[in-house]
């Protein structure tokens, strides 16, 4: 008599879940670029600062860059940072800087052009030129930062990114710059009479269309190099931060899909702000919240069984200041143990 079909699978072992920490990221010494991102308000900055702290214990030099206009890393470390890498107080090898790529190229005011028909026509052509490659100003801002950072030879760079849309533009900036440069080369003769004036207004000095194109071309080798590194899982990874709620889970899935399209490696998720009720101190609100979060945690574990999913607790205090960041950072390597009844 034939054996039931299920018998051959009866003793098959369950798939072991991956370690629920960021140890794999800390231990991967080949990594040069680590992005931390997700929906707004989920604790990206706390997680990225904590990751940078742990990396500083095992790497020669670590730089954390905030590309979020909110610039929360100054709040997290309780220290003001600027566009220049600044040493974080209390560390010898951890540096931080804050940039706002969205400022890029400001819109030119009408007053500059007055009533002159020729200048008015020039403005229209400039607007047409800039609109031909949307995002070029932001992308060039990223490109300049990358050029500077590459020259500083930090052993690893952590990006505390802005909410998802900005993050995807950051990861796509090499493509945007190359496309924009190609478009500029096509129309440079058309806009040449006005390029010098535009450059003066943007603070780039005297420059004609050929010089501007040449200046952009100088950054292309760096941009292409960074682009290749971004797509190399040995050098780049992305850590998604979320909370156990529907919208955050949805945004995380969308982000992971977009990262796959960009060929960016990602195999770590941090689920932050989890509520763990204390059996000795019953709280109906906490228990209700825990029940909701548990439902979405189960979904995440089913959906992302090939990811390291770190679970971090909601704390009764802000994670602010070097000492608090230090303490919180240990949770990235040691799974949190919730209170249990005796």
Swiss-Prot record:
Domain of life: Eukaryota
CC per GO annotation: GET complex; nucleolus
Disulfide links within the chain: none
Ligand binding (ATP): 39-40, 43-46, 245, 272, 313, 315
Residue numbers binding Zn(2+): 283, 286
One GO term (biological process): tail-anchored membrane protein insertion into ER membrane
InterPro entries: Anion-transp_ATPase-like_dom, ATPase_ArsA/GET3, ATPase_ArsA/GET3_euk, P-loop_NTPase
Active site per database record: 68
Keyword list, A-Z: ATP-binding, Cytoplasm, Endoplasmic reticulum, Hydrolase, Metal-binding, Nucleotide-binding, Nucleus, Transport, Zinc
CDD domains: ArsA
Compartments where found: Cytoplasm; Endoplasmic reticulum; Nucleus, Nucleolus
Example of a GO MF term: metal ion binding
Gene3D superfamilies: P-loop containing nucleotide triphosphate hydrolases
Principal localisation: cytoplasm
Record EC number: 3.6.4.-
SUPFAM superfamilies: P-loop containing nucleoside triphosphate hydrolases (SSF52540)
Record text on subunit structure and interactions: Homodimer. Component of the Golgi to ER traffic (GET) complex, which is composed of GET1/WRB, CAMLG/GET2 and GET3/TRC40. Within the complex, CAMLG and GET1 form a heterotetramer which is stabilized by phosphatidylinositol binding and which binds to the GET3 homodimer.
Similarity comment: family membership: Belongs to the arsA ATPase family.
Protein name, as recorded: ATPase GET3
Organism per entry: Xenopus laevis (African clawed frog)
Lineage: Eukaryota, Metazoa, Chordata, Craniata, Vertebrata
Gene name per UniProt: get3
């Amino acid at each position: 008599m034939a054996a039931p079909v299920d018998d051959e699978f009866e003793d098959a072992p369950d798939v072991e879940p991956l370690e629920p920490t960021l140890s794999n990221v800390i231990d991967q010494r080949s990594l040069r670029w680590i992005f931390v991102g997700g929906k707004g308000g989920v604790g990206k900055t706390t997680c990225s600062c904590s990751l940078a702290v742990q990396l500083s214990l095992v790497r020669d030099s670590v730089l954390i860059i905030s590309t979020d206009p909110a610039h929360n890393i100054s709040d997290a470390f309780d220290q003001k940072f600027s566009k220049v890498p600044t040493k974080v107080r209390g560390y010898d090898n951890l540096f931080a800087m804050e940039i706002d790529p969205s400022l890029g190229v400001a819109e030119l005011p009408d007053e500059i052009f007055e009533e002159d028909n020729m200048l008015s026509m020039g403005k229209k052509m400039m607007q047409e030129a800039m609109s031909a490659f949307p995002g070029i100003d932001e992308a060039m801002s990223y490109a300049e930062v990358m050029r500077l950072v590459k020259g500083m030879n930090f052993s690893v760079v952590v990006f505390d990114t802005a909410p998802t849309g900005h993050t995807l533009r950051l990861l796509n900036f090499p493509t945007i710059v190359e496309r924009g440069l190609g478009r500029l080369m096509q129309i440079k003769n058309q806009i040449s009479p006005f390029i010098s004036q535009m450059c003066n207004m943007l603070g780039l000095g005297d420059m004609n269309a050929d010089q501007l194109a040449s200046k952009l071309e100088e950054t292309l080798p760096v941009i292409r190099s960074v682009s290749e590194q971004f797509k190399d899982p040995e050098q780049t990874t992305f850590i998604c931060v979320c909370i156990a709620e529907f919208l955050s889970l949805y945004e995380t899935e969308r982000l992971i899909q977009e990262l796959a399209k960009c060929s960016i490696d990602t195999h770590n998720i941090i689920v932050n702000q989890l509520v763990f009720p204390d059996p000795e101190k019953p709280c109906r609100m906490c228990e209700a919240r825990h029940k909701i979060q548990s439902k979405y945690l189960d979904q995440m574990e089913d959906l992302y069984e090939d990811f390291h999913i770190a679970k971090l607790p909601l704390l009764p205090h802000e994670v602010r200041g070097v000492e608090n960041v230090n303490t919180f950072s240990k949770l990235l390597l040691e799974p949190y143990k919730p209170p249990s009844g005796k």
